[in-house]
């Protein structure tokens, strides 16, 4: 179960990629703006300021996140992102740190590009850190007993969870889009006790937590602490450096054809 309060513990750090993503969208006006994977809605509110005349549509698969978004005045809907269909007036589709949970997300992006109106925008950001220690140590510990029997049905994300910027760009260019894609690594300077553990508790560990009772969960967390400290050693000043690679794809639907016409 997703916990909005835990997720928001690092709101500033998690928010920066969202703002970086939205800043590259070229739509000056929009009729409808959709936030797919809106989470607790703290960032969705910014979309209403960026496009004040637009209808803001928000979706998330977590009822807890949707409830938190509604408390912020967001008209959010609980639903599977795979079933979302754009309305005819949709001019901007944004998904920040959500589509990596959907194995077929690249196909979804292409489908959207084929039905959205020309001149609309698709902006997606996904994590690209699934081979880093913050994921690897969780998988390694979960393979040990007594945990293995509890989490054996979890499809831990490993390998090609997300594509490369070039692969996404190629698919969307083939669909007629003009594409901007990049993959920076953010160096988060975290503070507090066991900050990397607390970070992944709000995201990557959510499906693991659902399999454990309270005692097993606390035991698992305690065993993770030294493993994460080895991978991300705290500095003497109390900060912990946490590198985090992310992939960004911003596509203007029909933009490739328009660019060719201009040239």
From Swiss-Prot:
Keyword Metal-binding: no
SUPFAM superfamilies: S-adenosyl-L-methionine-dependent methyltransferases
Any one GO BP annotation for this protein: methylation
Presence of keyword Kinase: no
Catalytic activity entry: trans-aconitate + S-adenosyl-L-methionine = (E)-3-(methoxycarbonyl)pent-2-enedioate + S-adenosyl-L-homocysteine
Main location: cytoplasm
Superkingdom per UniProt: Bacteria
Entries under CDD domains matching the protein: AdoMet_MTases
The enzyme's E.C. designation: 2.1.1.144
Primary enzyme class: transferase
CC per GO annotation: cytoplasm
Keywords annotated in UniProt: Cytoplasm, Methyltransferase, S-adenosyl-L-methionine, Transferase
Pfam families: Methyltransf_25 (PF13649)
Molecular functions per Gene Ontology: trans-aconitate 2-methyltransferase activity
Compartments, record wording: Cytoplasm
Family (UniProt): Belongs to the methyltransferase superfamily. Tam family.
Function statement: Catalyzes the S-adenosylmethionine monomethyl esterification of trans-aconitate.
Protein name, per record: Trans-aconitate 2-methyltransferase
Top-level taxonomy: Bacteria, Bacillati, Actinomycetota, Actinomycetes, Mycobacteriales
Primary gene name: tam
